[in-house]
Each structure stands twice: as C-alpha cells, then as structure tokens.
C-alpha cells in the first residue's frame, strides 16, 4: 500500500531550488532508507514528507488524506538533538513520558499500559538504567537514544528519523537497526530514515532511495533499490 506519494515536487531556499520535479511513492510496512552525498537535500525531503515545509510546486500526499498531517500517528526525530545542554533540567524518564502526552486527556493520567510502554521504549534503546539521570549529563549518542525512545513511546504508525545513529558506537548502531527491523516486522509499522552507513544498514532495509544530482539540475534523480535483492536480506 502506498503511504506517501510525492509528484513533481520542487522546493528550495531563497531563489535556489534544492529538489526539482521529484516523484516518489513510499510504501507502508517497510524500513526505508534515504541516502545521498552531503548536501543532497535528504533532511529537506523528510521535512517535505512531514509537511514542515511546503513545496513550491507539485504535491505531497498521504494515502488517507489530501495532505500529510502529523500528530499521534507520526513521530519524528531530527538530526540535531544537541539543544539538550548541560543545564537541561529534565530527567530522562520525564522526556520519554512526554511522548505519551498526545494520547492523554487534559489531566494527563498515565495508564499502566502507558507506563509499560515508556519502560519498554527505554529498555529497547538500552537507556532504562539512565532513567533518573538528567538529560544534560548525557553524551550526544545517549541523547539521541532517548529521543528515539520518546518517539517509540508515542507508538506511532510511522517513525521518521534523520540520521538516528549519529554519535553512537558501532554496537549501539547495529542494535538500533535491529530494533527498527523488529519494529517493522513485529508491529506492522513503517520506518523512514536518512542513513550514510550502507555497509551497516543495507542488510536491514527493505528499500533504499538514493538522491542523485543531474548536471545543472537539483536533487531529483532517484535510484530505488530493493535491499533484499541488493544486500541479500531474506524477506
């Protein structure tokens, strides 16, 4: 089933287009990677899909609505989480619990199931033992992991991640990719992420989208590969 459909999309900054006449369909129930050289507008593509920016021309649609709408069904983890500086007062578990707020009523009463979801999300990213630590005391990679835990605590149908393994060591990166693969296969979710390390991620992906530039044109030439064929992953 097509989840997102982009047709002839052009977008840029100032007077300079960075994406031109891009047409792309993204399918539900897959772990999808987006790759390309530095400056290939990968993060911009995510923002277009999320509806955070509007295309200059063309259309960006969700399969069930005229325009993409966020909310409880979509969680987004941006590339930069360094805004949690050393003085950031909140504890890890407080931030992850905030991922459930959109599903709560006015008085934000947590159910037992929601508390279990918060605990499970922290354990999935290996941060449960840090739950009472202040966020400002954590390393960059640890901050990245708790932001992913917060997104998982929202229990979204669609999880969108911009270079989620940034700042992590190899063991943590591979653990994250295994987690995302499990999230898709066992919970019927869709994950879309920007990635550079294809030697690590390729075996976990269903589909890889490569942004390329044609001479004197913006980033619009797409090469879409089935990763089960390219990297030998069994479906």
Protein language model regions, located:
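Conserved ABC transporter NBD signature motif
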Residues: 58-72
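Conserved ABC ATPase "signature" region
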Residues: 97, 112-130
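H-loop/switch region of ABC-family ATPase nucleotide-binding domains
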Residues: 195-196
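Conserved catalytic motifs of ABC-family nucleotide-binding domains
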Residues: 155
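Helix-to-loop junction immediately C-terminal to a conserved catalytic motif
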Residues: 50
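Conserved ABC ATPase signature
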Residues: 134-138
